[in-house]
């Protein structure tokens, strides 16, 4: 279910522990994403098939606001390791440690952009005609 607790759990899985001071911002982000999706699909609720996308979008909105207004709070996020290669079949995972020219802030920005944009094409499959 897409709610504030699901977004909290997603943030924990990313290495950020939401505190009591984050409650208002989390509520705002969840409602913003819920409203955005409902307006795009012309529906009353976020469909079950879009919940994982909504959770990531809300987490991305929250991390973006933290990065903008309280960047010191994001010290718990580990941005040193990024998966460089994943091979299906004989499992082969290679980490891109020290590779690339991106700073940790640029990697955070790229990750936030991914969270905000991932799955937007899937939203279209849930659209209804507006009369």
Task: Describe the function of each predicted region.
Residues 47, 51-55, 60-69:
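Mature extracytoplasmic domains of secretory-pathway proteins
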Residues 61-131:
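Short loop/turn elements at secondary-structure junctions
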Residues 1-53, 104-131:
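Conserved short "hinge" loops at termini or chain/domain junctions
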């Amino acid at each position: 279910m897409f709610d504030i607790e699901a977004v909290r759990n997603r943030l924990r899985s990313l290495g950020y522990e939401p505190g009591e001071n984050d409650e208002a911002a989390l509520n705002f982000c969840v409602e913003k994403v819920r409203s955005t999706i409902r307006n795009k699909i012309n529906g009353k609720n976020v469909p079950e098939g879009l919940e994982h996308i909504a959770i990531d979008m809300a987490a991305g909105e929250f991390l973006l606001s933290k990065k903008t207004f309280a960047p010191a709070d994001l010290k718990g996020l580990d941005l040193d390791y990024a998966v460089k290669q994943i091979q299906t079949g004989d499992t082969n995972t290679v980490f891109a440690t020290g590779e690339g020219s991106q700073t940790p802030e640029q990697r955070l920005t790229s990750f936030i952009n991914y969270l905000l944009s991932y799955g937007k094409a899937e939203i279209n499959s849930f659209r209804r005609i507006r009369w």
